[in-house]
Amino acid sequence: MCSSDLGDYDGLSVVPRPGHADYTAGVKYGGHADFAGGGAFSGRLTAPLCIAGGICLQLLKKQGIEVISRIASIGSVEDVTPLTVSTADKPFPVVDDAVGETMRAEIAAAKAEGDSVGGIVECAVLGLPVGLGGPLFDGMEGRISSIVFGIPAVKGIEFGIGFWAARLRGSENNDPFVVENGTVRTTTNHCGGILGGITNGMPLTFRAAFKPTPSIRSEEHTSELQSHA
């Protein structure tokens, strides 16, 4: 995943690109920041994360744990079909293929205008035992979030119904417990499979928001930092 011309990145320490880490990295690391291809802040670093994830998926499968995911939205286009099966074999990983075509059109429209769009990825972990995690800083939400935010362009995360829970009453948000065939489960999963930072045996679900790709063809404003122009 090489850059075709590293010269494209010359001068970014004094003329930072909007939406990129050029300015913040330049201030923090001074003359030691690597701007070629975005350096440590490049979206290319998604590639090794995918490799590591692929290995982890195989190890988890041996434990009876499955991780499934899908594109939940692109721009304003949302796939509201529940995530229940893997979309890994699809070239465009959505549950509803018709909605996927609309998402593709949304991407193409932004590209034609020299712009970009963001999106949301939804994940579910199936087969987790009860009792993983802990309170406070050992909670599953915190541990997962620290990893997810290591993915380039991630700007937000929510577990279960996330921020929507703030609009509900406790009686609406609470997940009732039932016992089926000797197994404790809940009739709903608003909590996303986590209570008190600890897994409860239900699918662990979360959604991660990705900002629009900052590298766009549209003209943008910035400043020449040395002359403050």
Regions found by a protein language model. Name each.
Residues 12-15, 138-140, 223:
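Short intrinsically disordered coil segments
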Residues 4-24:
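Glycine-rich, N-terminal phosphate-binding loop and its surrounding beta-alpha-beta segment
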